[in-house]
Amino acid sequence: MTNLLINVDHVGTLRNAREETFPDPVHAAARCEQAGADGIVFHLREDRRHITERDVRLLAETVNGKLDFELSTEEEVVSICCDVVPDLATLVPERREEVTTEGGLDVTASRPRLNAVTDRLYDAGVDQVSLFVDPVPAQIEATAAVGANCVELHTGDFAEASTEAARREEAERLAAAADAAHEAGLRVHAGHGLDYNNFSLFRETVPHVAEVSIGFAVMARAILVGMDQAVRDMRATVANAQP
């Protein structure tokens, strides 16, 4: 079965919008795990717009399942990741002006730096290192060449497709990328924009997906039905959509 990791960034977004101490991403993570999540994802951005270093260290101490630390290659953030040693480190692109991550890494253009950071993460004791990339063959090949043992496929174009035909076309593109990643020996992860409505088509079409990261859809639903129910609903969606 595909593992479900819940991203708690937007709990921090809500907290920080009022410069409050609540809601707490650490408490939210515990509720997500209690409701059936296989693990927790967070992105420590350079500008600390949602998750803070305090959150990171408490999540590292309290999460019982898998912990996925999303990060750029910025030196301070890499050092923090090496210090807390998550189960998985996912390298992502980052621009201060973006609202959310807008696309995958250009691994082919950044191989020396990505190679150095990947090696450093392994040396620190991180078991899995993943690169977040668009479903493009050249990026899959470069991910393997850099030394990562996982790849996270960017599903944003699939999620944002305006027609059913376009969405199916993007699903097939993701399927080809997943096949290529599997052939290259990479563990396949996926995320960005996956939700209760589009996940079935995604999973029925795209093979080899060991793990998905879903955040915004779950947090938005939690406002209406509560965190426990939102996570349980997503857990059921993932379980029922196996190929």
UniProtKB/Swiss-Prot annotation:
It catalyses: 3-amino-2-oxopropyl phosphate + 1-deoxy-D-xylulose 5-phosphate = pyridoxine 5'-phosphate + phosphate + 2 H2O + H(+). The lineage of its organism: Bacteria, Pseudomonadati, Rhodothermota, Rhodothermia, Rhodothermales. 1-deoxy-D-xylulose 5-phosphate binds at D9, H10, R45, H50, T100. The gene is pdxJ. The keyword Chaperone does not apply. The keyword 4Fe-4S does not apply. Homooctamer; tetramer of dimers. Catalyzes the complicated ring closure reaction between the two acyclic compounds 1-deoxy-D-xylulose-5-phosphate (DXP) and 3-amino-2-oxopropyl phosphate (1-amino-acetone-3-phosphate or AAP) to form pyridoxine 5'-phosphate (PNP) and inorganic phosphate. It comes from the Bacteria. Belongs to the PNP synthase family. 3-amino-2-oxopropyl phosphate binds at N7, R18, G193, G215, F216. It comes from Salinibacter ruber (strain DSM 13855 / M31). Its main location: cytoplasm. One of its GO terms (cellular component) is cytosol. The record marks E152 as: Transition state stabilizer. It is found in: Cytoplasm. InterPro entries: Aldolase_TIM, PyrdxlP_synth_PdxJ, Pyridoxine-5'_phos_synth. The active site is at H43, E70, H192. Pathway: Cofactor biosynthesis; pyridoxine 5'-phosphate biosynthesis; pyridoxine 5'-phosphate from D-erythrose 4-phosphate: step 5/5. PANTHER family: PYRIDOXINE 5'-PHOSPHATE SYNTHASE (PTHR30456:SF0). GO terms for molecular function: pyridoxine 5'-phosphate synthase activity. It is an enzyme of class 2 (transferase). This is Pyridoxine 5'-phosphate synthase. One of its GO terms (biological process) is pyridoxine biosynthetic process. Its EC number is 2.6.99.2. Keywords: Cytoplasm, Pyridoxine biosynthesis, Transferase.
